[in-house]
Amino acid sequence: MLYALLLPHVAAFHAFNLIRYITFRAGGACLTALVVSFLLGPRLIRWLKSLQKQGQPIRADGPERHLIEKKGTPTMGGFLILIALTVSTLLWADLRNGYVWAVLMITIGYGALGFADDFLKLTKRNTKGVPGRIKLVVQAVLGLGAAVWITQLMPGSIADSLAVPVFKHLMIPFGPLFPLVAMFVMMGASNAVNLTDGLDGLAIVPTIIAAGVFTLIAYLVGNRIFSHYLEINFVPGTGELAVFCSALIGAGMGFLWFNAPPAAVFMGDTGSLALGGALGSVAVATKNEIVLAITGGLFVVETVSVIVQVFWYKRTGRRVFLMAPLHHHFEKKGWAEPTVVIRFWIVAMILALLGLATLKIR
């Protein structure tokens, strides 16, 4: 919005020329989202508490202390993230850019699905929410729509291929099936963040870290000079997603202020499904789907732990982990919640560095 409002007046007010620079607008987006979160957070939390007298339903089969320590904490805090992210993006991004709208669509769409899930959990007082099959169908429809939209915006030479990091210009062609691959990336990322969101601050910090990595990736991929120098795919227009990712960082930090242990609010599926969808769609748009799996490796490991646990239990009647997802396994082993969370953050930082390294290793 500011881009469209200020750009025509650059000749009269030279300072407005700053609005041309993605880096300036990215910084503004991050700061704006942070301020919106700080201003809106206390009011939103009070409102959620007034609506949710008993707070988020807690899993009866989870760690015992959760039934005591987390009882009464309101959920749907993802509203705070979505509002701050959307307001900041609309304010600072170039709204003529199709990638921005596609990524916003999947983020808000998955957030709406998460809201429905949280609402059913609260009204029915259980941890089930929207039936799994219905949730997957809605995710698939939204993801496929966004995937088709994004691929239509891309240069035809790379639109239907999956980029392989490290190897120069190695692309795996999928042809007309690529939107299905992109849909899987978005759905997988969304559900992976959702599974990771089980402890105070556990999901939001790795999300912020991944968003930081993709802020840089979006800027480089959308810049002809830098992409040529690094020998990565040049995708015109995706530089604008650096503004979106920066807004996500600011919104995430603002939410963390209230989600730090002991959490005053949980993001719920409203936040976790939306955040994963945001990361997945940005990865698809920047042709860095595999890099997301590396950078967000913590989310991948958490998801795999659930898949392995369910598969092995159905096959043998025994469990591989004391409890899944993996963070609950370590809780059951006696690790304190802050210990689990901080160590997982460290792992997320290491994986983010590995993801960044793929940009230079060729």
Swiss-Prot record:
Its EC number is 2.7.8.13. GO terms for cellular component: plasma membrane. It comes from the Bacteria. It is found in: Cell inner membrane. The keyword Membrane applies. The keyword Methyltransferase does not apply. Keywords: Cell cycle, Cell division, Cell inner membrane, Cell membrane, Cell shape, Cell wall biogenesis/degradation, Magnesium, Membrane, Metal-binding, Peptidoglycan synthesis, Transferase, Transmembrane, Transmembrane helix. One of its GO terms (biological process) is cell division. CDD domains: GT_MraY. It catalyses: UDP-N-acetyl-alpha-D-muramoyl-L-alanyl-gamma-D-glutamyl-meso-2,6-diaminopimeloyl-D-alanyl-D-alanine + di-trans,octa-cis-undecaprenyl phosphate = di-trans,octa-cis-undecaprenyl diphospho-N-acetyl-alpha-D-muramoyl-L-alanyl-D-glutamyl-meso-2,6-diaminopimeloyl-D-alanyl-D-alanine + UMP. Its cofactor is Mg(2+). Pathway: Cell wall biogenesis; peptidoglycan biosynthesis. Catalyzes the initial step of the lipid cycle reactions in the biosynthesis of the cell wall peptidoglycan: transfers peptidoglycan precursor phospho-MurNAc-pentapeptide from UDP-MurNAc-pentapeptide onto the lipid carrier undecaprenyl phosphate, yielding undecaprenyl-pyrophosphoryl-MurNAc-pentapeptide, known as lipid I. HAMAP family: MraY (MF_00038). Belongs to the glycosyltransferase 4 family. MraY subfamily. This is Phospho-N-acetylmuramoyl-pentapeptide-transferase. It comes from Acidiphilium cryptum (strain JF-5). The gene is mraY.
